[in-house]
């Protein structure tokens, strides 16, 4: 029987702050911050190559009951479905948005899987401006 990949939790503030320097993947239900650990960091934390995940639900989302409900939904979605897509030796922080509370569970799991596997993708059709625009007239003069 194939053993499940163990997903560990981020619990310390320093771990959350380290992940903030990584890649950010935005979605309608949450923001996902992703950072790959170096081998030295994995050895120091004694985590091996297991992925780690942390959850942030701010007071802007509601009172403690609502925040905990959002956190529980995200944890269950990771445990049941999206955890299998997580890369080894990678830390994930999920910053929940208010819409995560009322979204259908299937949509939540699909969005999590999409954000976990979307490595460095940019929206096509949008060009980044590389040069500053020419200065135009001030106040229509």
From Swiss-Prot:
PROSITE patterns: RIBONUCLEASE_P. Pfam families: Ribonuclease_P. Residues 114-123 have a biased composition (Basic and acidic residues). One of its GO terms (biological process) is tRNA 5'-leader removal. Residues 37-56, 114-141 are annotated as: Disordered. Keywords: Endonuclease, Hydrolase, Nuclease, RNA-binding, tRNA processing. It is an enzyme of class 3 (hydrolase). Its EC number is 3.1.26.5. The keyword RNA-binding applies. It comes from the Bacteria. Belongs to the RnpA family. RNaseP catalyzes the removal of the 5'-leader sequence from pre-tRNA to produce the mature 5'-terminus. It can also cleave other RNA substrates such as 4.5S RNA. The protein component plays an auxiliary but essential role in vivo by binding to the 5'-leader sequence and broadening the substrate specificity of the ribozyme. This is Ribonuclease P protein component.
């Amino acid at each position: 029987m194939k053993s499940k990949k163990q997903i560990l939790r981020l619990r310390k503030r320093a771990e959350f702050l380290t992940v903030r320097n990584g890649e950010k993947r935005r979605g309608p239900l949450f923001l996902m911050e992703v950072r790959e650990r170096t081998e030295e960091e994995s050895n120091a934390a004694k985590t091996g190559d297991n992925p780690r995940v942390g959850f942030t639900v701010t007071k802007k989302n509601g009172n403690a009951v609502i925040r905990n409900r959002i956190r529980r939904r995200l944890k269950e979605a990771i445990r049941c479905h999206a955890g299998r897509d997580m890369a080894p030796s990678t830390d994930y922080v999920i910053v929940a948005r208010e819409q995560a509370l009322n979204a259908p569970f299937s949509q939540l799991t699909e969005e999590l899987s999409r954000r976990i596997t979307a490595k460095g993708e940019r929206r096509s059709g949008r060009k980044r401006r590389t040069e500053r625009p020419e200065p135009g007239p001030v106040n229509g003069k």
